[in-house]
Amino acid sequence: MSYLLRLVVPDRPGILGAVATALGESGIDIVSVDVLERGGGVAVDDIVVDLPPGRLPDSLITASQGVPGVQVESLRPFAGPLDTHRELELLESLARAAEWTAVKLLAAELPRVFHSGWAVVLSGDGEGLCEVLAASDAAPTFDGMTVPWLPLSSARLLPSEADWLPERWREMAIEMMAAPFGSPRTAVVIGRSGGPAFRRSELLRMVHLIGIAASVAHLPPA
């Protein structure tokens, strides 16, 4: 079974090699490594690994944290192969789709691009009430909810402890980030339950992708 391991590691040469060695000695294969961000002497890495049959996920944590200075921020099951060209494929699909289907396609595919749990596209009425234009599988219900940040002028992180969230959502530690889609009254929200919190680098990546997607989705189909 595949897992997505998010590590906070010392930003020094050889550290990923040490992690790879520790995992390999435990019979764990690394599928891919994605450096999310670095600064302040540390780096944040997403590592997709294959866990051998019969091994417990805890063995990933034990092996990783056996390397001095390495901390496991999160461990989640990972469904599907990592595709470094997925963003380009999404944009190409949006270019071929009619505008109304492009929104649904965007919501369906973004969770795979960002290794998140779900995505929704919301439309606001200017007073905080929202309507769901499209939603991926596993997305919670936003219809009729008051979201004080909509209209949205710029992308932002939406932490799980925010006061506007339903109590049930706070208990589930639902982490989100949002970006305008075409106009301040329409926003794309990407979320994951139980964390980890989205990083600033993930938000910047979202801004870039959604900005291009908004332009592509509003063009006539190719």
Where are these regions (language model features)?
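Hydrophobic, well-ordered secondary-structure segments
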Residues: 88-91, 103-107, 203
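Helix-loop-beta substructure at the N-terminus of cytosolic sensory domains
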Residues: 99-138
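GAF sensory domains
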Residues: 122-191
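Amphipathic alpha-helical "output/dimerization" segments
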Residues: 198-214
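Short alpha-helical interdomain "coupling" segment at the junction between an upstream regulatory sensor module
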Residues: 216-222
